[in-house]
Amino acid sequence: MTAGSDAGLDDWLDALDQAEPLARSAGDDELAQSVRAAFDIGGPLARLDAGYKPREPQLQMSQAVARAISRQQALVVEAGTGVGKTFAYLVPALLSGRRTLVSTATKSLQDQLYLRDLPRLIEALQMPVRLALLKGRSSYLCLHRMKQARVSGEFPDRRSALALARIERWAQITRSGDFAELDGLDERAPIIPIVSSSRENCLGQDCEDWRACHVVKARREAMEAEVVVVNHHLFFADLSLRDTGVAELLPSVEVAIFDEAHQLAEAGVQFLGHTLGSSQLLDLGRDLLAQGLAHARGARDWQGLQNGLERAARELRLVCAGSLATAGRELRGTLKLGWRERAGQPGFGEALQAVHEALAQVLEGVIAVRDAAPDFARLAERAQQLRDLARDFAVEPAPGDVRWIDLSPFGARLVESPLDISEAMQQQLQGPPKAWVFTSATLGDDAQLSWFTEPAGLADAEVLRVGSPFDYAAHARLYVPRGFPKPSDPGHAGSVALLASRLARRLNGRTFVLTTTLRNLQTVADGLRERFEEAGDAIAVLQQGAAPKRVLLQRFLDNPDSVLVGSASFWEGIDVPGDALQCVLIDKLPFPPPNDPLVEARVKRLEAQGRNAFSDYFIAEAAIALKQGAGRLIRTETDRGLLVVCDPRMAGMNYGRRLRGALPPMTPVANEDEAQAWLAELAAARG
């Protein structure tokens, strides 16, 4: 090549370098202008609401999302309550015309997007967009297993038998097979695993109901749609197992949006690891007995094989519970237990070996009759996978992974998982180019949103923080009682109940009490009932665990003259706008439990890096949880209320300033008299 041609090549490359950003800028401008016009006072979105007015924070976020889509970049957005983040990401995605995947943490938001928000926007924008909703297998009715359940006639209780009859009637008319269509059917109902499939027991194309399969239809519709709504669990389950239909979808997706992104890392950690639990053994035993009696009666002692699995499951739970079982301690939730303490106990290795042997016997029996029915091939695969897991848990974990044991009233589960999702997300970001958008109302308490971006592997993503348009200074008060008992004081929970009763009495209910532990929840709820009874107040106390979450919330909405006491699941995802909720009390600062095995492993990693684990982890986690809990109070621009944090460390410790800074800018009150005066003003305004 000559010198002249070298110069010509250099000129051409220079021109290309200049042209690419110009072309990208033009694309940016085109989509950004369309988005801006959509949000204009005379734009299509105004047709959705007679009182519509543009919101600057919403427009700011929508423009950032439009840029990320045009440039196929990663964007992380923390958008305060009231910004309207859902429309801020959906409008640019729809107007871009690109294939979009939207993922949520909860099925409730997933349903809201698919059933309400997206149809409204599509109508307003007049865009013929095909939508699809894709959930995990357990959300759909399996026709094959429903028929099996009727034939076997074995149910955990009478209620399950009645539920099956109702499901059979519904099966005749449902198009989607989504259990969410069945009002009153709790997603934790014991009938659901009986009439839904799992990756392990699905027969695939060998199933006689394959053509009518609801899971297959949902995945087919997702492959044909321009916008698909999934959830985080489904997304990560697919990265791990490649069994949910998302893997086939992702390569063709050009925009991936994750709402409720603050739950993304924990969802990923659950699914990127491995688990072996007593419930898996019991489920296998139930299916084994049903299939054995249906297709190979007399060929093997199916009842004996099931009994062996049940014994192994029972022994596994007992050895995992250890002294908790002998002490007769009643479990109300799930306990996370350290691996080394339990694995080093006498009998643990023997229990794992018993699981291995029971599964080996099942595998031998099933292989002998595997040609009798397609179900036996799946049973063999399940038995082999569980047997291999029992072998793996008997040796050291993979480098960089952490192990623990989940113990519940119903069973035990051995878990091995990575410490975060950074490696998995980096692999996705390095795949086919696409825009990645991650958003939530709470993603960090610093400018880089490092609480979220570090464990998610998004340190290089563009970061945007959009504040709430609400006037918190005028509409909300923050009360941190000075001189209050410390959380370590035995009388702390009782003092929380006493203060909550006085404040709730001023409002005649309309109060949430959020606790950090189930023990405090019980103490506070009991204390409130006692105080209200003594005073002759007709204020109801609604307690988490007394009924399903959505039932309790509906009772609170129907009767605001009540106090709802809830723990972890009530700190977020609860929306009570208006004057039905005007006071939120938090019992103490929500630091993560230091003895949690996952917390311990993360702390060790930070310390090995020479970092301050208390500042970089514990305070950061507490700030996020505190912000989530406080977010229950003000849900609309006209809401007013009082936030109370019953922890003197919030006012007295140096880190208290950082935690207060993580909250919306509420006006502080100095003492209970001022707090009561504010509540009296709110009560008077209701009339």
Task: Cite the ranges covered by each PLM segment.
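A substrate-engagement module of RecA-like helicase motors
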Residues: 2-48, 98-226, 233, 288, ...
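Conserved pre-motif I regulatory segment
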Residues: 25-77
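Signature of the SF2 helicase/ATPase Hel1-core->accessory helical subdomain module
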Residues: 95, 111, 116-119, 199-200, ...
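Conserved RecA-like ASCE P-loop NTPase motor core of nucleic-acid helicases/translocases
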Residues: 100-106, 438-439, 509-516, 520, ...
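Conserved RecA-like P-loop NTPase helicase motor core
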Residues: 481-491, 544-650
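Conserved helicase motor "Helicase C" RecA-like lobe of SF1/SF2 P-loop NTPases
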Residues: 516-545
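Walker A/P-loop NTP-binding motif
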Residues: 66-67, 86-99, 116-120
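A contiguous, basic/glycine-rich beta-loop/short-helix subdomain that forms a polymer-engagement track
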Residues: 193-228, 239-247, 361-484, 491-498, ...
